[in-house]
Amino acid sequence: MIRIRFGMDVLLVLLLATCLLSPTHGTPLEWDFAVTLRTKIQFMDSSWQTIATAAHEFDELSALTFDESEELIYFNDLKHRNGSIFSLKRDLIAANHVVEQTIARTGNESVAGLAYDPLTTNLFWSDTEQRKIFFASIHGSATPKVLVDLSAEGGRPDGVAVDVCRRKLYWTNSNVTHPTVERIDLDGSNRTVIVNSDIDMPRGIVVDQLSDRLFWIDDLKGVFFSVESSKLDGSDRQVVLKDKHHEPLNLAVTNDAIYWTDRTTRSVWSHPKVPVIRVTTTSKPEEEDSTDATDFKDPEPVAEDCPLVRVANLSEEARGIVARTGFYQRLQKDHHCASIVRKVKQRVDEQSRKFEVSSLLDQKMKVLENERCMNNGEYKAATDLCICPTGFKGSRCEIRECHNYCVHGTCQMSESAYPKCYCQPGFTGERCEVSVCAGLCLNGGHCRASKEENEAPTCECPAKFGGARCEQNSTEICSLFCRLLKHEPEMYVPFGCHSICEELAQGNSTNIAVPQYQHLEVCLTPTVWTSSVIIILVVGIVSSLLLVAVIVHGIRRLYKPKRPRIRKTFVVRKQARTNSAGDTPLTNRPLATEQCEITIENCCNMNICETPCFDPKLVEQTLSKSSCKEDKKILIHNMEDDLY
């Protein structure tokens, strides 16, 4: 029995693993956009292909919002008898959706906008009938509380949006007599009007956490509408789009585009958040007999007209819309949102621990679930969702966002957790897919891209063309001067046009005049090496050589060693030396009663001269009176005397 039980457990584990690890189709998990129609919720992927539908049991859906932390959709039904707001989640076992009542109906509510705070798990909604904004927790059955009451002032709250990171609620007041865009802290304090001018009937509103900006729809008078944007405090207001023949209700924002629902065409439309910049050149056709000079200027960047794109045609009236923003991955490093993301993650982790069990089967299932998420992704059993680390995406974190993203460059993840390309020299664009030389040089010019990052590319123009992009045809310009010169002989003509005018005059001398320059031969053959230049150059070289010689001679005199100083030493012996036995008058000099020896150093060309001194007193007197030269003469003279 034990063996059979164990085999059944293993078989069950394998079957469940197959369900977990195999891709699921037709379920709301893989969606990127969700749209509420009148009787259903439609889920679509990034290419706006329908992958699933849900909530078919309802009759009058309106607003919706998305809790990305727990993969929950919250929506409203205007005609349900018991409930007002419901939640939709995916069933892990049946691979289907489950709808539960979240907020009970208390009267004739007319919900226009929904927003969710994942930190406090509170829902916020606007009621156009009661002219109030309510909030309530999704856990428990407490009576909803009023956050903002606009009934006394005649306001009409419409769209609502929660700034999760800065803990504020934004809403639009669509009262046509006094429309506004306002905000308030989530605790009900610090109510502020941020936009109250040049606005007609604001509808949907959304907070873009990636760019720290607000986006809202304004249903203008007549058939016009606009999409506007501002900073979170209402400053730096911009009109992103203005068009007509739409009846927009709600909008959603992604990293690069804005999407909104249109009740008139039953469609979803899109427009870029930032206009695309392109470079255009406008050329004016030149007439043959024109006499007006044309100024050639470098082209300037022009904002390209971004047309509206209908991304989805729907079978019913389109109302609410939400988009997946990557709350966990994109805001982990944002200095405003990092702490909030961490707290939300802790709350979800604590809730996930309630599902943990210790049986053998559950342990094996947990191993398989953890293996479902690749690249260190974190598996959430409560939502069957992989929370991917920065740089990875996909239902199993199997896709590296930088893989093949940059065409000619290096990809790195930015602080906003989006791939960013650092382009090689010569390429630009979001993915380094555009060459800086593409279409730059005209008329056969050759483009050279600089190796420096901030240096613009240059064009090497062929003969008779010039300008930054070789857009200036010197032949055409000079032909214009040559024609004008025929009618105005005193007009100035650039020197480079002389040869061109001569060529044109050979075939059409009646309409072309050749400019006559004074001293043309000087301009054509300039002589650089004149006699005066050569003389100045020679004098300069000779002066330089003399200066170098003087400097070298002075250095040698400065560092030449000094002559040694003559020193004299006198040694006097009072006792005469005794003659030896071999001394004779012929071999030895007569001995005096007193004898002195004089040792003179550094004289006689650095030799030591030893000479007898027969009159020390005379020498002493002489030393005190005579100079060194006289001493030398006396010594030499005494050596030559006959002493015998």
Curated annotation (Swiss-Prot):
GO terms for biological process: canonical Wnt signaling pathway; oogenesis; positive regulation of circadian sleep/wake cycle, sleep; spermatogenesis; triglyceride homeostasis. PROSITE patterns: EGF_1, EGF_2, EGF_3, LDLRB. Disulfide bonds join 402-411, 406-421, 437-447, 441-459, 461-470. Residues 27-531 are extracellular. It is a single-pass type I membrane protein. Residues 1-26 form the signal peptide. The keyword Amino-acid biosynthesis does not apply. The keyword Cell membrane applies. Glycans are attached at residues 82, 108, 175, 190, 313, 473, 508. CDD domains: EGF_CA. LDL-receptor class B repeats lie at residues 121-166, 167-211, 212-257. Belongs to the cueball family. This is Protein cueball. It comes from Drosophila yakuba.
